[in-house]
């Protein structure tokens, strides 16, 4: 199957590996030439994401997946053009926008900084019938718990409880709130399987998970393996409310939104829906637990999980 991928970021690096293994043919939509794609034998199309510049690359693709993550209005503008281009395309009638976070079916406004740029695109998809689409929900990526040499996913500093650069762990809430964790490579393998599902079989929301856990348990595993003695603290809901009241910059507001994302339990992916979608879409995909991935690092210390 010929698949277009909008954006060449961290997740796309896994896509270039796993989709090719699955037998799919890729074309990466990118604003600038990426020489590394040439060495992988992956096609690329230079675009400014205007509908006219997307017309030719999408003409012979069957599916478009966006990995463009942005918390500004640029996300809305680019994704609106991606939808319009798919509607004009004679073949590309399936679209997966860049979501890949929480249970946005139950918590559409989590994380808070996602809502304003993302919700107009969700509404645009709901209001049309030309394209088949789905919003993919995965919880948190497990990859942040391993050293950077073992992942394509970049560090996000204090926005993740395990702050490698800061050498500290800051856990929102009690740390016992349920959170689902999924490895990025498994998400991509799931996407490669999802696009092979029969036309008309996609649901508005698709759920994936490697395991249900919580921040206390997940960080305990990582601390034992990588950072014994690293300082650990918890941030209460009351403290987060205070952060929001006194925030003087966007970074503090975004950090508070990340804290609320965990405290609200929005990253607990519905177990019944995870199981239903494993049976419906992902019967050939193995979703690894956090411990599974850490064991793989032991066996292959220089591998990208």
Swiss-Prot record:
Pathway: Mycotoxin biosynthesis
Keywords from the UniProt entry: NADP, Oxidoreductase
Disruption phenotype annotation: Does not affect the production of swainsonine.
InterPro entries according to UniProt: NAD(P)-bd_dom, NAD(P)-bd_dom_sf, NmrA/Isoflavone_reductase-like
Source organism, top-level taxon: Eukaryota
Intrachain S-S bonds: none
Gene3D superfamilies in alphabetical order: NAD(P)-binding Rossmann-like Domain, UDP-galactose 4-epimerase, domain 1
Listed EC numbers: 1.5.3.7
One Pfam family from the record: NAD_binding_10
Reaction(s) the record says it catalyses: L-pipecolate + O2 = L-1-piperideine-6-carboxylate + H2O2 + H(+)
The keyword Repeat appears for this protein: no
Keyword NADP annotated: yes
A single MF term (Gene Ontology): L-pipecolate oxidase activity
Function: Oxidoreductase; part of the gene cluster that mediates the biosynthesis of swainsonine (SW), a cytotoxic fungal alkaloid and a potential cancer therapy drug. Swainsonine production occurs via a multibranched pathway and is dispensable for fungal colonization of plants and infection of insect hosts. The first step of swainsonine biosynthesis is the production of the precursor pipecolic acid (PA) via conversion of L-lysine (Lys) to 1-piperideine-6-carboxylate (P6C) by the aminotransferase swnA, the latter being further reduced to PA by the reductase swnR.
Sequence similarity: Belongs to the NmrA-type oxidoreductase family. Isoflavone reductase subfamily.
PANTHER family: NMRA-LIKE DOMAIN-CONTAINING PROTEIN (PTHR47706:SF4), NMRA-LIKE FAMILY PROTEIN (PTHR47706)
Name the record gives this protein: Oxidoreductase swnR
High-level lineage: Eukaryota, Fungi, Dikarya, Ascomycota, Pezizomycotina
């Amino acid at each position: 199957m010929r698949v277009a991928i909008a954006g060449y970021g961290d997740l796309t690096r896994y896509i270039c590996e796993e989709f090719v293994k699955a037998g799919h043919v890729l074309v990466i939509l990118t604003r600038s030439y990426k020489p590394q794609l040439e060495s992988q034998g992956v096609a690329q199309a230079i675009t400014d994401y205007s509908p006219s510049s997307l017309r030719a690359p999408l003409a012979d693709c069957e599916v478009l997946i966006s990995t463009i993550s942005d918390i500004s209005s640029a996300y809305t503008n680019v994704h609106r053009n991606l939808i319009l281009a798919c509607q004009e395309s004679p073949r590309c009638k399936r679209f997966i926008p860049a979501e890949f976070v929480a249970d946005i079916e139950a918590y559409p406004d989590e994380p808070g900084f996602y809502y304003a740029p993302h919700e107009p695109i969700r509404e645009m998809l709901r209001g049309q019938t030309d394209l088949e689409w789905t919003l993919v929900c995965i919880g948190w990526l497990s990859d942040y718990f391993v050293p950077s040499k073992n992942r394509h996913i970049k560090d996000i500093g204090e926005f993740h409880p395990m702050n490698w650069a800061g050498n500290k762990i800051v856990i929102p809430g009690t740390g016992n709130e349920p959170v689902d964790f999924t490895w990025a490579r498994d998400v991509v393998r799931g996407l490669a399987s999802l696009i092979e599902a029969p036309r008309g079989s996609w649901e508005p929301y698709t759920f994936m998970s490697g395991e249900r856990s919580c921040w206390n348990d997940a960080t305990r595993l990582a601390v034992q393996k990588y950072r014994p003695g690293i300082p650990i603290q918890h941030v209460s809901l009351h403290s987060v409310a205070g952060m929001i009241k006194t925030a003087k910059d966007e970074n503090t507001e975004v950090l508070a939104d990340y804290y609320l994302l965990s405290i609200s339990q929005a990253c607990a992916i519905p177990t019944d829906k995870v199981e239903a979608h494993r049976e419906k879409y992902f019967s050939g995909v193995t979703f690894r637990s956090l411990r599974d991935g850490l064991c793989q690092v032991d066996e292959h210390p220089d591998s990208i999980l």
